[in-house]
Amino acid sequence: MSRLPSLSRPCLAIACSALLGGCVAAGDVRPFAEMAPIVPVVAPVAQPTAGAIYAAGPGLNLYGDRRARDVGDLLTVNLVESTTASSTANTSISKKDATTMAAPTLLGAPLTVGGLNVLENSTSGDRSFAGKGNTAQSNRMQGSVTVTVMQRLPNGNLVIQGQKNLRLTQGDELVQVQGIVRAADIAPDNTVPSSKVADARIAYGGRGAIAQSNAMGWLSRFFNSRLSPY
């Protein structure tokens, strides 16, 4: 059995690393948190009362609105989010060292070899480091997601949860919304702005060719990680 040349072994290792990196990049760029499945709420069947005109149970309120208030009701969240962040960091470090050792003497006379003070020594060092970092990010989100009321708290607030999954030509787009809504903030058309959602968890991203083109490769991620020596 012939052995591989010494030069081909590093090339083979690099090729295997590239293939593994391609396999990793083929997965989801940014996985989403798994939401609990929305279980439909079955309303209890009211037992008819003999001899009564009105029966207990859910009915249509002629003088009320159709805002979400109970578990299982639907509510539309209008996404109006805009964030801007920037950060700048500069670091500069320098250090200099100098040490001189005088030549020893014997009976007041220096020890020399051929007229030179061979035992005289001096050392010096100079180290410096400079680093600079700049980050800027701006995000804007507009749209709407219809969510489901998952729980009604004792104070009347509603725990909501929902997501929207769009299957596009070049991939998938997913929007997830979770949070707590105050019943008084729900508009008459059964909508609420995302700025009124407490403990809001809004996730937006995608899977597919478009999302892959916006992600760094495995080698770039290595040089930007803590494992990079540079």
UniProtKB/Swiss-Prot annotation:
The similarity comment for this entry is: Belongs to the FlgH family.
What's this protein's function?
Answer: Assembles around the rod to form the L-ring and probably protects the motor/basal body from shearing forces during rotation.
- Describe its membrane topology: Lipid-anchor
Secretion signal span: 1-15
Among NCBIfam families, the record links this protein to: PRK00249.1-4
- From the record, give the cysteines joined by S-S bonds: none
Give the UniProt keywords, A-Z: Bacterial flagellum, Cell outer membrane, Lipoprotein, Membrane, Palmitate, Signal
A GO molecular-function term, please? cytoskeletal motor activity
This protein is called: Flagellar L-ring protein
Q: Where is the lipid attached (S-diacylglycerol cysteine)?
A: C16
Quaternary state and interactors: The basal body constitutes a major portion of the flagellar organelle and consists of four rings (L,P,S, and M) mounted on a central rod.
Q: Which Pfam families match?
A: FlgH
Name where it's found.
Cell outer membrane; Bacterial flagellum basal body
Q: Where is the lipid attached (N-palmitoyl cysteine)?
A: C16
Cellular component GO terms held in the UniProt record: bacterial-type flagellum basal body, distal rod, L ring; cell outer membrane
Protein's UniProt keywords contain Lipid biosynthesis: no
What GO biological process terms does the UniProt entry carry, in alphabetical order? bacterial-type flagellum-dependent cell motility
